[in-house]
Regions:
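Amphipathic, small/basic residue-rich leader segments at the start of a protein or domain
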Residues: 1-87, 107-108
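A short, Trp-centered hydrophobic/proline-enriched beta-strand micro-motif
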Residues: 115-123
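Short beta-strand segments that buttress and anchor functional surface loops
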Residues: 122-125, 166-168
Length: 168
């Protein structure tokens, strides 16, 4: 499939490519050895507005379309896929709240993201994999909130996140 890029998209791709090569690439090998990305690189991404790319305009984000968003993170992933996935996972989690939550929940979630925070995505379970129909986790409403009983694996962004989407 051939994509026809607009002038704006071409300029944005070049900008992201140049920034990734100059600012991100020098840290990739050390981040791989250390097993984590330096906090200042995430701050750099926040300064670029990467955390707002797929947040809808009505919630205070850029509201970029999916194609442009994909182009941005594809370009970043060419240098460091893990770095790109850290931001993308936040959008995947937010998208679930926008589609299945209330407008108030979506606004709350977007407000967390706008404060330079990451989200985690907890779907996979030891006996179910990512088969949603086979999940055993439960969330039961109590007087104090919710009681979550879950066993999850592969919680994407689990070590960085301030807000979690947990599938039950």
């Amino acid at each position: 499939m051939t994509l026809l890029y607009t002038k704006e998209q071409k300029a944005l791709i070049k900008l992201i490519h140049d920034v990734a090569e100059q600012e991100l690439k020098p840290y990739v090998a050390e981040a791989d050895r250390a097993g984590e990305c330096p906090a200042e690189l995430y701050e750099f991404g926040f300064d670029l507005g990467l955390h707002l790319v797929e947040v809808p305009k009505e919630y205070g984000g850029t509201g970029l379309d999916y194609e442009t968003t994909a182009m941005i993170f594809e370009e970043l992933a060419k240098v460091d896929a893990g770095y790109a996935i850290t931001f993308v996972t936040t959008f995947v989690a937010l998208r679930n709240v926008i589609l299945a939550g209330t407008p108030e929940q979506a606004q709350y979630f977007a407000d967390v993201v706008k404060q330079r925070q990451f989200a985690a995505f907890a779907l996979t379970e030891p006996n179910a994999g990512s088969d949603v129909a086979s999940l055993r986790s439960t969330a039961v409403e109590t007087e104090e909130g919710y009681l979550l009983n879950a066993s999850k694996t592969f919680i994407t962004n689990g070590g960085l996140a301030q807000i979690y989407i947990v599938f039950c």
